[in-house]
């Protein structure tokens, strides 16, 4: 997971991480392994017509007034870095804590996770909203998730969790990335229905369209998958995900590493029927890659046509191919996404089908078969000149294992390498590990690398409409010691969020951010006077000119 961890949990034995034999970690790793890390529209599904050509991003708007990048006589200084965590719903790994909670309980738990994100100085959250052919919103394409309702009958919980989650994330100035598993249809038994159609919700699409379903692997750990090689199944899962894009004000569409399933020894994915019908003489491995490529390309194009400001990104397995297999590959010796799960991640970047990529580098620095310090530069070189942002998937779940992961500084050191190589963000797996803070590792890297707030890095391919310079008109201390500002909007496009700077020596540093409409404050102004400036940002993170200074 984000299906990621499961992804790594399914590595071949030579890359399987060592396990610390404590009850907590055993439970986490078990859950990770399981990850593999409304009514339907009609009984017969007709795929939609091809998506129109993607809308091109308009040229950047240059607003008038204010100063660009300066607070009075000094430059402003802000870190541009995506910071987030995966909030995993399948098997109730992170959230909700158990199935069948009341609306009030679910909401309270979610708000605590957002409080954690704010305390970590994150600016995004990645929420698992389609874990297994189900939904955390009222959907015409999928049953309600049993991990939310506690039932497998598809009945509504009577409220809309997605609307609540998006609104509350935005209220805290967190981007909301909706995390989907496109092809996974069920979880294995005994907790999930496995490959037993009789245990599916009555409105599960695979019950209506059994020709779309493939069971894999054989035996007790079987799941049902939407067949990636069936064009009607592919169109359906695209429509199911785009329903959420259409209905909700999300900031990103996010996939993890699960496309074709990770291979089981001695068992090939049983897609003979669709290969015979649609393969058209293409070698099966290439045909499978083509199927996944088509999903990725079509999702990119359809998101652009529907809401061009919504980001599209994928968090793949951390190895594309090994150099021993392909000279373009990485200096590694592990499972290969290209060959083993038919995910040509390198191609997706080079073709510009993604806005960001989050490779799961869940190995330690110095690990011989997959060295973090060697894989990181491979990925940074891949994205150069493409416009695709590189964020790294960090393996917080491994902290506390034997060996290198018993060092609380392991992720701290990895983030130092990320900064050295110009990585533009990190996403941590998973939320529960950040809350538990084993060995104090999370506190350590937060204090070293996330000590100050950060702005989301803008993307040139997205629409740009930076607002005009706002105004700081007054400031006063409240009873809690915060400095509260009175502001006025600038001219031109409306700001989506704000950034507050305070002059410190020869620069003005970022001290706080917030959503437009929220109170502008400096939470720790100190006892003496200070000089401040304010800016507005558009939806894509483009900053407008800075206000005139206000000294208080």
Per-region residue spans from a language model:
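Catalytic domains of carbohydrate-active enzymes, especially glycoside hydrolases
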Residues: 108-134, 247-252, 347, 353-354
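Substrate-binding cleft of secreted/luminal carbohydrate-active enzymes
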Residues: 342-368, 379, 385-462
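Aromatic-lined carbohydrate-binding/catalytic grooves of carbohydrate-active enzymes
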Residues: 120-157
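Pro/Thr/Ser/Gly-rich low-complexity, intrinsically disordered linker/stalk tracts
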Residues: 445-492, 541-552
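Glycoside hydrolase catalytic-domain groove-lining segments
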Residues: 277-328, 335-402
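Active-site-adjacent "subsite" loops/lids of carbohydrate-active enzymes
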Residues: 80, 88-108, 178, 183-243, ...
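Aromatic- and acidic-residue-enriched segments that line the glycan-binding/catalytic groove
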Residues: 135-150, 184-219, 257-280, 324-335
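Beta-strand-rich modules
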Residues: 522-543
